[in-house]
Amino acid sequence: MTTKNLETKVTVTSSPIRGAGDGMETEEPPKSVEVTSGVQSRKHHSLQSPWKKAVPSESPGVLQLGKMLTEKAMEVKAVRILVPKAAITHDIPNKNTKVKSLGHHKGEFLGQSEGVIEPNKELSEVKNVLEKLKNSERRLLQDKEGLSNQLRVQTEVNRELKKLLVASVGDDLQYHFERLAREKNQLILENEALGRNTAQLSEQLERMSIQCDVWRSKFLASRVMADELTNSRAALQRQNRDAHGAIQDLLSEREQFRQEMIATQKLLEELLVSLQWGREQTYSPSVQPHSTAELALTNHKLAKAVNSHLLGNVGINNQKKIPSTVEFCSTPAEKMAETVLRILDPVTCKESSPDNPFFESSPTTLLATKKNIGRFHPYTRYENITFNCCNHCRGELIAL
C-alpha cells in the first residue's frame, strides 16, 4: 500500500464567536483545512506535516461544534483499536521521492511551530491509520451483517407471534376458515378411507358367514355320520363277541369229541387185536392220526374191521336200513353259532344247507345294515358337502 494519491479532508464546523466584555471571549476558530498528501519531488514543494495538531482555542479540551439540540445529542465512546504487528507492512519510497504535504492551514496557529516529519515515519503512520480504518470498516460490516440477521430472525418471530396472537384472539377469520377447510378435506379423505375399509370388512364378513354355514352343515353331517358309525361299531362289537363265544364253544366241543374219538380208537384197536388172537394178523396199529378227520377215518376203518371179523362179509342188501326220519339235535355251541349267523345274514343262513351249518359269511354282509347317508355332488362350489339322505334315496342328485 503506497501513499500515492492519498487525500485526507478535515472539516471543522464553525462555532458562534462570543464578543468581548463578558469574560468568555473566543477567538475565531481556524477555517476548514484541506490537507493533501502525496509523493512529489522535494525540489518544487516544501515538506509539511498533514497531521499537525490544530491550534486549540483558549478553552482547551472543548470542541465547539455549533448549536446542539439536547434531544438529538449522542454520546460518543472512544474505542481502542489494536492492530497486530503482522498486519503492518512497510513500503519504503525511493530516494528520489518524498512525501510532501500539499495542504496548508489558513490562519494562524498559536504556540505551535511548523515542523517537518520524516517521510518514513509519516508513511508508517498513514499505513497504520488506514489499516485501523479498514479493520474498523470490516468489523462494522460484520456487525451490520449480524444485526441484519438478527433483524430478519426477529421479524420472523414477530410474524409468528402475530399469527399466534391473531389466532388466539380470533380476529383472523381467513386463517380460521383455511384451517377449517383443511380439516374438512382431511376428514373427507378419512371418511372415504373408512368407507372403503367398511365395504371390504362387510364383504369379508359375508364370505365368513357363508364359510360358517358350510362348516356348520359339514359338522352336522359329520356328527350324524359319527353317531351312525358309533352305533355300527357297537353292533359289530356285540356280534364279534357273540361270534367269538360261539367259536370258543365249538372248539371246546370239538376238543371233547376228539378226546372221545381217541378213546374209541384205542378200544377198537384192543378189541380187534383180541379178536385176532391165535389167528393171522390182518390189522396192525398204524401211525397215530394228526387231525380230527384222520381220527374219524381211522375209527371208521376199525369199526369196519371189527364188523367184518364178527359178522363176516355180509351183503349190503341184507343190512338193515336206518330210518331216514331221524333228526340230529344241535349242541349248545352249534345253536349259538347258528344264532350268530342268522343275525349277521338271515337270508344266507336260511338258504344254507343243513350239512354246512357253519357257513362263513363275506365281510360285506356284516355292514349290510349300515344306512347310506354319505352322498356327495361333484359340481358343487364347496367341496365335500354332505347331503343327509335316508337309506331309501336312490335317485340322482341335481344341483340347482
Swiss-Prot record:
GO biological process: Golgi organization; Golgi to plasma membrane protein transport
Coiled-coil residue spans: 120-213
Keywords on record: ADP-ribosylation, Coiled coil, Cytoplasm, ER-Golgi transport, Golgi apparatus, Membrane, Nucleus, Phosphoprotein, Protein transport, Transport, Ubl conjugation
InterPro entries the record matches: Golgin-45 (IPR027095), Hsk3-like (IPR013183)
Chain positions of motif Tankyrase-binding motif: 18-22
Comp. bias intervals (Polar residues): 1-16
Pfam families per the UniProt record, alphabetical: DASH_Hsk3
Subunit structure: Interacts with GORASP2. Interacts with the GTP-bound form of RAB2, but not with other Golgi Rab proteins. Identified in a complex with RAB2 and GORASP2.
Comment, domains: The tankyrase-binding motif (also named TBD) is required for interaction with tankyrase TNKS and TNKS2.
Entry function: Required for normal Golgi structure and for protein transport from the endoplasmic reticulum (ER) through the Golgi apparatus to the cell surface.
Protein name: Golgin-45
Protein source organism: Homo sapiens (Human)
